[in-house]
UniProtKB/Swiss-Prot annotation:
Belongs to the glycosyl hydrolase 18 family. Chitinase class V subfamily. One of its GO terms (cellular component) is extracellular region. It comes from Aphanocladium album (Wheat rust fungus). The active site is at E171 (proton donor). It catalyses: Random endo-hydrolysis of N-acetyl-beta-D-glucosaminide (1->4)-beta-linkages in chitin and chitodextrins. This is Chitinase 1. Chitin binds at G102, T103, G129, G130, W131, T132, Y172, M237, A238, Y239, D240, W378.
Length: 423
């Protein structure tokens, strides 16, 4: 139980967090305004429409502030391109005509635009890169010419598709030169966004974010203060702390280290967040990323113990969709020191680390106390519905979410139906 002093400290921290989030974000680097409420963002993957059968209409749009549509690929010369044109803008959904006049967007692009019209507080951002498609970022960011190409290409897709901003998922800058080039790349994109807005969108503030590492080997290379100036959001990938690469079973997304069981907590979120803040990132630009999946370990006696293999998964070995958890016969346990949960089945000796709704509530309370900017989830197709939904739990816990409206007017989109607002 908290003492009176600790309660007072907690109250002060909460008031500071509310005060910080009540003020629009500003900086000298072009970020003039961003929503004052909390973000509740979620990644939507275009490959999810296939085997997972998760379509844009399945998103809990009324609970989400930002959809991060992933992923676009990038060439070494800086050009952005679609890795799946069918999913992005060719697939015809129910109600889509094959006889429309002109050049029109279909697929996820049209479906997301329609969702934007129905849910004016839900913004959609174009996410570029990802783990698989980060190979060409170093080259694309290496010169002023390639950075300009990247910025123009990215903003071109944004306006053609009727999106609200750009999210860059570069995993990861490998050294100081790449880290500085990342800043220059982001500055080029920010400049291009503002230039487009001035000419075609009445100065509207389009958003710019990144997916950011939570491991010190990667985040210690970043230019924290400069990132804090140019970005609206830094979406911290505070997960994948343990997995097939680990020597012991461990928590996937724990807040703290556990000194009594260090093997279970090789990384932790609190250290990462503090590093970003100490480096000069405003706390309310940091968004806490959380997994909608679990990582499994086989033939183990428990958390922080040796294991043998990771087993199968929902779509790839060792990774289970949250909606498949906990498995029958497994008991959910939580480490109250580390703030991490897992399921364990003593008969099969399988351990799966994942976040429960109660842990999401704990994390939301924690991030509010830190004055952070909200939550992000990877990724939408793995979620449950109803009271067990992690996205819904976050939505309810955050309370005052970002209510800035999305943008619908794209007069120079190359797609006639987006140009006309789907009217």
């Amino acid at each position: 139980m908290l003492s009176f002093v600790k309660k007072s400290i907690a109250l002060v921290a909460a008031l500071q967090a509310v005060t910080a989030l009540a003020t629009p974000i500003s900086s000298e680097a072009g970020v003039e305004k961003r929503g004052s409420g909390f973000a509740n963002a979620v990644y939507f993957t275009n490959w999810g429409i296939y085997g997972r059968n998760f379509q844009p209409a399945d998103l809990p749009a009324s609970e989400i502030t930002h959809v991060l549509y992933s992923f676009m690929n990038v060439r070494a010369d800086g050009t952005i391109f679609s890795g799946d044109t069918y999913a992005d803008y060719e697939k015809h959904y129910a109600g889509d005509s094959w006889n429309d006049v002109g050049t029109n967007a279909y697929g996820c692009v049209k479906q997301l635009y329609l969702l934007k019209k129905q849910n004016r507080n839900m913004k959609v951002m174009l996410s570029i890169g990802g783990w698989t498609w980060s190979t060409n970022f170093p080259a694309a960011a290496s010169s002023a010419a390639t950075r300009k190409t990247f910025a123009q290409s990215a903003v071109g897709f944004m306006k053609d598709w009727g999106f609200d901003g750009i999210d860059i998922d570069w995993e990861y800058p490998a050294d100081a030169t790449q880290a500085q080039n990342m800043v220059l790349l982001l500055q080029a994109v920010r400049s291009e966004l503002d230039s487009y807005a001035a000419q075609y969108a009445k100065g509207h503030h389009f958003l710019l974010s990144i997916a950011a590492p939570a491991g010190p080997d990667n985040y210690n290379k970043l230019k924290f203060a400069e990132l804090g100036k140019v970005l609206d959001y830094i979406n911290l990938m505070a997960y994948d702390y343990a997995g097939s690469w680990s020597n012991y079973t461990g928590h996937d997304a724990n807040i703290y280290a556990n000194p009594q069981n260090p093997n279970a907590t090789p990384y932790n979120t609190d250290d990462a967040v503090q590093a970003y803040i100490n480096g000069g990132v405003p706390a309310n630009k940091i968004v806490l990323g959380m997994p909608i999946y679990g990582r499994s370990f086989q033939q183990t006696e428990g958390i922080g113990k040796p294991y043998n293999g990771i087993g199968s998964g929902s779509w790839e070995n060792g990774i289970w969709d949250y909606k498949a958890l906990p498995k029958a016969g497994a008991t959910v346990k939580c480490d109250d020191t580390a703030k991490g949960c897992y399921s364990y089945d003593p008969s099969t000796k399988e351990l799966i680390s994942f976040d429960t709704p109660a842990m999401i509530s704990t994390k939301v309370s924690w991030l509010k106390g830190k004055g952070l900017g909200g939550t992000m989830f990877w990724e939408a197709s793995a979620s449950k519905k109803g009271s067990d939904s992690l996205i819904s739990t976050s939505h309810q816990g955050l309370g005052s979410q970002d209510s800035t409206q999305n943008y619908l007017d794209y007069p120079n989109s190359k797609y006639d139906n987006i140009k006309k607002g789907m009217n």
